[in-house]
């Protein structure tokens, strides 16, 4: 089946409504929305700007807000005014990686059912890149990048979009609960476990 090269008005409206439902934000710019789905391979063959800059922006927005949300959840000021982390740095890193990785982002795109709307060049179409995990993850990042630019970098919009699209609060709670439940307490690690649970 040959892919369409451009969205029609009905496609744009459908995607806007779906993205609003999943992120809490309605993208105003139809051009930016189309660009989020336009791969470089198409732009080389035809015309227009690709989604690469939106992908880059979305990657940075995701990274920042996921770290912020984990930090808000797992860190606090102590009596001395120091920032006290309830988790170690290596756990923080692995937690962030578990929450945001290519497989997770691709699975969200699959759940949304929108990879078929990617606008690709002939070589990408032939190789069915729209089915590749990395390409789907890039699409997710592009959508977040469009939300950032379209909202004029509104921090409330961005945090809400990241929380909602990743189901971050529920997933974070589940991961932390499962990790703490799987810890075994013995003489060697009892103090560490108690500190982390405090």
Which residues are covered by each model-predicted region?
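Double-stranded RNA-binding/processing signature
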Residues: 1-198
């Amino acid at each position: 089946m040959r892919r369409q090269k451009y969205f029609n008005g009905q496609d744009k409206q459908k995607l806007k409504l779906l993205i609003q439902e999943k992120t809490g934000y309605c993208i105003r710019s139809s051009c930016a929305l189309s660009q989020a789905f336009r791969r470089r391979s198409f732009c080389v063959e035809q015309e227009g700007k690709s989604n690469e800059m939106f992908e880059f922006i979305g990657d940075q927005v995701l990274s920042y807000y996921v770290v912020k949300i984990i930090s808000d959840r797992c860190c606090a000021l102590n009596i001395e005014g120091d920032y006290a982390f309830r988790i170690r740095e290596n756990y923080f890193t692995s937690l962030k990686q578990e929450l945001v990785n290519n497989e997770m982002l691709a699975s969200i795109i699959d759940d949304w059912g929108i990879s078929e709307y990617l606008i690709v060049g002939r070589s990408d179409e032939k190789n069915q890149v729209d089915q590749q995990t990395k390409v789907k993850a890039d699409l997710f990042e592009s959508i977040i990048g469009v939300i950032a630019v379209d909202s004029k970098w509104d921090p409330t919009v961005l945090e809400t979009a990241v929380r909602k699209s990743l189901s971050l609060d529920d997933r974070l709670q589940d991961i932390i609960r499962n990790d703490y439940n799987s810890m075994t307490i013995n003489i060697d690690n009892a103090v560490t476990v108690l500190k982390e649970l405090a």
